């Protein structure tokens, strides 16, 4: 088995999907988790205005609506939270996403004060916090806020990790990679677009250029620029298609470098890192 085949098998990617079937699969998955854990009454998710959180948010809202109808328990709810660092440049996109999602509860926690305070506290030791490192502090501040809300509302935190993000490990360890449940896992980027289209989303919500937008020295830098490979190439790779040698090398390099992000803290019994 080639490395490409191993990755596809591990991430559970299908070359062709039925969007309606995958929507139902994700919604049922989210509902099943709530049923199994009756002490949970909510899902919490940060909404950025990008494709992934828009999709995960709408799926979560559908899941809790069905839970309320099926259980006659009106305490189930989806909590969407905006987590800007100061003023977000594409705030309009985030508001459009919220309009589409129609969450039960919409909150805002501005992370600027906490992220800046942590940066100052670390630099007070004499350590230098790079722009990239501060970007990770921002991502982890968002994780802390989501878990604080989940703790207040008997909730679980939804993550937006999907196959195209996972294969490149394009997420912050214990930041946006920190979550309880991943309803998009198994889907690549173009398949996520198919689900949003099937859900009736405005194409503008999934056709915008993806960006993590964590670095102040590189504001709005596109994911594809940071990765050195396009999402079309990543998706083709995950669907078992042939890609250029350069694209394959880049994708597989990210896969190897990011292995530590896909595991719990390493123990003496782990072998994957050797």
UniProtKB/Swiss-Prot annotation:
Keywords: ATP-binding, Ligase, Magnesium, Metal-binding, NAD, Nucleotide-binding. Deamido-NAD(+) binds at residues 140, 173, 180, 260-261. Catalyzes the ATP-dependent amidation of deamido-NAD to form NAD. Uses ammonia as a nitrogen source. GO terms for biological process: NAD biosynthetic process. The gene is nadE. Mg(2+) binds at residues 52, 165. It catalyses: deamido-NAD(+) + NH4(+) + ATP = AMP + diphosphate + NAD(+) + H(+). Pfam families: NAD_synthase (PF02540). SUPFAM superfamilies: Adenine nucleotide alpha hydrolases-like. This is NH(3)-dependent NAD(+) synthetase. GO terms for cellular component: cytoplasm. ATP binds at residues 46-53, 160, 189, 211. GO terms for molecular function: ATP binding; glutaminase activity; metal ion binding; NAD+ synthase (glutamine-hydrolyzing) activity; NAD+ synthase activity. The keyword ATP-binding applies. Pathway: Cofactor biosynthesis; NAD(+) biosynthesis; NAD(+) from deamido-NAD(+) (ammonia route): step 1/1. Homodimer. The keyword Magnesium applies. It is an enzyme of class 6 (ligase). Belongs to the NAD synthetase family.
